[in-house]
């Protein structure tokens, strides 16, 4: 048995982490066995570059463990959504183009599904409706941009799909419980 945790560098990895399973139980995956063995050997050795090698091995171990936990057996979340080839197309479009004024019909078309089938399938797989996920993704991107303090609130609003700073400020305040300006100052 191997236990561990990951500390994600992104200050707002909460959305993605909340959509990952808390526990991944894997059996009979040879690649994982090899990686676990390598992690054990490297952690016992006192060689130069040990920390760098361990960091990379553990990153690969995480990816392989998550890959093995996808599909219908996975709990609702991002992995299950990405494991569905049709939903994955829509998710990648949302992630790649958060400023686009997506509609349910457009996302369903990307997934080659009817609106009702897309809504049902997405909600069942990801654990939340598509437009709720899109809002959460946009707010996650906005928080990251605000933390950097490189853009005005209006520029952040434009990058995450809002036509005006005031509309964005209202949506952000409702979602986050504070204004974008205040959020940026606190970081």
Please place each PLM-identified region on the residue numbering:
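An amphipathic alpha-helical interaction segment
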Residues: 2-96
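Basic/polar phosphate-binding segments, predominantly the helix-turn-helix DNA-binding elements
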Residues: 60, 64-70, 89-140, 145, ...
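Short helix-capping/turn signature of helix-turn-helix
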Residues: 148-149
């Amino acid at each position: 048995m191997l236990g561990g945790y990951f500390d994600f560098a992104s200050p707002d990895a909460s959305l993605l982490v909340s959509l990952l399973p808390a526990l991944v139980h894997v059996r009979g995956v040879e690649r994982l066995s090899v990686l676990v063995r390598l992690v054990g050997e490297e952690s016992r050795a006192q060689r130069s570059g040990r920390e760098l090698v361990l960091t990379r091995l553990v990153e690969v171990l995480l990816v392989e463990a998550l890959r093995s936990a996808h599909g219908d057996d996975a709990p609702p979340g991002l992995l299950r959504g990405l494991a569905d080839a049709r939903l994955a197309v829509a998710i990648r479009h949302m992630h790649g183009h958060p400023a686009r004024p997506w509609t349910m019909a457009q996302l369903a078309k990307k997934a080659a599904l009817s609106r009702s089938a897309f809504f049902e399938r997405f909600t069942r797989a990801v654990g939340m409706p598509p437009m709720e996920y899109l809002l959460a993704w946009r707010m996650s991107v906005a928080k990251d941009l605000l933390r950097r303090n490189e853009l005005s609130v209006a520029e952040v609003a434009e990058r995450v799909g809002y036509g005006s700073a005031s509309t964005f400020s209202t949506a952000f305040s409702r979602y986050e419980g504070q204004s974008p300006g205040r959020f940026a100052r606190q970081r």
